Amino acid sequence: MRRSKTAAPWPGTIVPRAFFNRMATEVAPQLLNKILAAADGRAGRIVEVEAYAGALDPAAHTYRGKTPRNATMFGPPGHFYVYFTYGMHWCCNCVCGPDGAGTGVLIRALEPLHGLEQMRAARPPRTRDRDLCRGPARLTQAMGIGGAQDGVDLVGARDGFAIVDDGMAPPADLAGGPRIGIRVGQDLPWRWSVPGNRYVSGAVPRI
């Protein structure tokens, strides 16, 4: 697998597009321990993810086809799909699979690594450091991710964000568990997290 030659905003190597050009259920557990890095210095280690499998997944935004809201998910892999939910929160996904697949990985939690002062300023006063990025809406707020970042190229690193491999391998022998906050597809074990990490939004029971 070839690596991107674009300079990474965090020590390591930008994860190449080929990494994302696979099924979301393959990409998701391998995203664990990668770094979500911003050009302004904010960075966190990915410790919790969920996969959404497009037309095969009734919980996916893309299950019923392409709309203006979810169009980014049908585009090329290695881009952000950022959506607004509950009338108040942003969530970010990595688009996976070939063009038109409509699949992706929701980043659910980060372990903050750098730029904590900026993260604290972006979150409500008196937020504990443990809670800065513990949950999908919290992490987008802490990292400065919103609607303007929908479609950002995470591989080119020219749009302010990248996924970086700093050499830490994903956890071995991971078991998936049920996804959170969905009404359908709860039986699919497509949520993964770093075992024992205190920044995970909740335990991942096995199905």
UniProtKB/Swiss-Prot annotation:
Pfam families: Pur_DNA_glyco (PF02245). Keywords: DNA damage, DNA repair, Hydrolase. GO terms for molecular function: alkylbase DNA N-glycosylase activity; DNA binding. Its EC number is 3.2.2.-. One of its GO terms (biological process) is base-excision repair. The keyword Metal-binding does not apply. The keyword Hydrolase applies. Belongs to the DNA glycosylase MPG family. This is Putative 3-methyladenine DNA glycosylase. It comes from Burkholderia cenocepacia (strain HI2424).
